Every structure is written in structure tokens, then in C-alpha cells.
Amino acid sequence: MRAACRGWRWNASDARHGLLVADKFRALYKRPTVLGVRVAQQIHEVCRPLAPLLGIWRGSGSGHYSTINDFAYVEEVVFDHVGKPFFAYSQKTKNPINGQPLHAERGYLRVINDREVEMVIAQPTGIVEILAGYYAANSDACVINFESTEVAMTATAKTVAEVTRVIRLENNEMLYDVSMAAMGQSMQHHLSATLQRVAK
């Protein structure tokens, strides 16, 4: 190494080149992040029809079921991407009166082709939903229908047999409905909410 470097002198041209390289690295690492992961600038081609989902959504919803009292909640949903053929999904809700945390879940929306989607959602209640479905979309709207193909539960989780989810989006407004068969009850409506996009 010393022999290779002998006689080398730093000059203005080298300095300019070094600054150009540094600028390129800074530009690369200034990309936005999702949960600490740098986000690719381009959405994966197969995900582009569902690009209207991307962003931060906030609003309110309500829930009911035959085994519990009716309730209300405020909610934040985030769909984001890292340039691969899926969207990352996170959701959290709070009590609208005292702000205490309620439900939360995280998962991935996997786009299979121009009609089919899959989704996996994990919940801190010990439940994991595996869903499959279909979608229709245009430049600013989409509808997605999911049905569970499997619901996995930890040993202490409440029993859930089946789940359906419907997501509708148009004009920066997202509406969804969730139905389920749980705790020995037949399939029935459980949740609905209306959210507005607050950031892309």
C-alpha cells in the first residue's frame, strides 16, 4: 500500500471528485424511511394500481358484536412501500374520550396480479389473519374484498373462525368494514370506519 501511494499528491480535481461522490451518497441516504427502512422511490409495477392506498389516514369508527357492548374509536392507518411487490400496513386505535390505546395491528398487503391480492395481519391479541381477495382500481379509487383463508391463534387468544374485510377508497377518503365469526357466534358485522388522507 505504501509503495502504491508513494508520490501521490492530493489536488483540486481529486477534491471536486470526492465532493461529487459524497453528494451522491447523501442523496441516496436522504430517502424517506418506513419504520427505519429506506424507501425506494419507485412503486413496484404490480402494486401501481393500488397506489391510491399509500399514505397516512386518520378518522373514526365504531364497533359492535353480539358478545360485547358497542364502542367507538379514533384511528390511524398507514400504507407504505419499499419498492417490492407488497405494501406495509399498520393500524392503531384510541379511545376518543380519554386517548387510551385500544386495538393495533400490523401486516403486509401482497399484490399478486391485476386482480388478486393477499394480506397477512398480526394482532397483539394473539391472532393472525391470512386473507385472500380481489380488487378493482383506477387512478384515484379502489375496492378490495378479502376473505380469510386461515385464522391462527395463540393458546390464550380468543377463538376467531373467519374474517372478511372490505376496503373502499375514493377522493382521499377510505371506508372499511370488518365482519367475523368469533367466540362461537355466526358471521356478523363488527367494525366500520371512515378515514381521510392526511399525508402521502
Residue ranges and their predicted role:
Residues 96-134:
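Helix-adjacent hinge/juxtasegments
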Residues 126-127, 144-164:
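Acidic, glycine-rich flexible loop segments
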Residues 59, 87-91, 117-121, 143-148, ...:
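Short hydrophobic/aromatic-rich beta-strand segments that constitute the beta-sheet cores
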Residues 12-18:
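Short hydrophobic alpha-helical segments enriched in small aliphatic residues
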Residues 8-10:
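Tryptophan (W) side chains
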Residues 30-86, 92-101, 164, 171-172, ...:
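Amphipathic/hydrophobic helical signal segments and adjacent flexible N-terminal regions
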